[in-house]
UniProtKB/Swiss-Prot annotation:
SMART domains xref list: EXOIII
Gene name of the record: orn
Protein name from the UniProt record: Oligoribonuclease
Record function comment: 3'-to-5' exoribonuclease specific for small oligoribonucleotides.
Annotated source species: Burkholderia lata (strain ATCC 17760 / DSM 23089 / LMG 22485 / NCIMB 9086 / R18194 / 383)
GO molecular function, one term: 3'-5'-RNA exonuclease activity
Amino acid sequence: MTDTAASTSQPALVRNELNLVWLDMEMTGLDPDNDRIIEIAVVVTNSTLDIAVEGPVFAIHQSDETLAKMDDWNKSTHGRSGLIDRVRASTVTEAEAAEQLQAFLAQYVSPGKSPMCGNSICQDRRFMARWMPEFERFFHYRNLDVSTLKELCRRWQPAIYKGFQKRAMHTALADIHESIDELKYYREHFLIPAASASAGESAPAA
């Protein structure tokens, strides 16, 4: 049922309540009441982003009527990437994808512990609350949104901001890895270095 199975060739990631769950979706548009999810992927990292484990990647089946409502940008982008063809061929529903993804994530972190991590992640969360509400509740209510650092860096350190070039693949898994790389970039060039490596293992605030 998955387009891409969970990776088994990466270093082992130990289950830890400080692990971070990264997520990205592709949608038919920007309005969760009228548009639908067409792809979803997850990646779990440790708290310092040194180890990453890829989860399954799902193209979510949607009707031709739903796909026909996409604007020109979405039709062009998702047609060029092959996603529209994958969506048409898929038999996976939002509910089935959510169930399998939650089972995968539970191997690495308990419900309610990880913030939802990604770029402009509030938009993904809006769609998840609409179409995958039980899965949305798996996450902590906080978000780890890399776009916050992006906007601050653009205003406070524009030269550093220009140093990270996005590839804009617009596929869920590629976008997740790009978000992780972007956060690593800001950590190295924009944020004050941590006093010690052990700082990342401190207990999170309530």
